Amino acid sequence: PVGIGISHARETLYIDLDSQSQETLDVLKEFLLSPNYNFIGHNIFFDGAILQAQLGQWMNWTACTYGLFRQLANEGWVGQKYGLKQAQLDLLGWDTRGDVELDEWLVAAGVVKNYEHVFSKWSAEERLADFRAGGSIRVDKSRMSLAPPNILGYYCGLDAYSTYKLYTEVLLPAIHRLPAKFQEVFTWYHSLFITNVELLVQQQLRGVYVDVGQLSQFETKTRILIDDYSGQFRRHPEV
């Protein structure tokens, strides 16, 4: 990673790793691996794997807002998006996503898909105009680390801030409003879900990957069964 965003109740910060001294990096590593702090993230399968590879140890992850968003969306629909940018709009009520400034910098700099074959002859202004109008330009987010710290840091900080807000102001209150018998499930949340994510990360770092094709087939079959049983329930004469 080129930087890390951290947020809590009082402040949010972004740490650009390339500009830090070794002493600062050592303190940061000690903080991230401390058992005295609880960490949350949006899709800790990704963030946790990246940090595990860099730190050599699994952090004290206690919640994944991406996982909770999906697990609590009992009335979700096919094609629903659960990414953090969508949650910023749908659950936090933001007017715009937190990556707009970053996306526009990348577009202006030519960090877009098919740049060499299609968009290299376009000026930065033409690319931005097309992007803002919802045209054919697509940002290449896989190379967003090319953005300077003042752009990338602001985006990363907003991600950290919105993840914290999503957890404390939306997801936790939703759990607390559940009937007692359902709240009991979340007392086992760490052992049921977080440890499974850790296992998947440890396997992947050792070359054992999830069979995504089989998993997708299983998801499709499960969705068909759920829809079938839901239909039977709604058609029941006593419902």
Task: List each language-model region with its residue ranges.
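Active-site-proximal helix-loop-helix substrate-binding element of RNase H-like nuclease domains
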Residues: 2-178, 200
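Secondary-structure capping and boundary motifs in well-ordered enzyme cores
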Residues: 80, 144, 148, 152-158, ...
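Surface-exposed helix-capping loop/turn segments at secondary-structure junctions
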Residues: 169-188, 231-239
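Extended, well-ordered alpha-helical scaffold/bundle regions in very large, multi-domain proteins
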Residues: 188-239
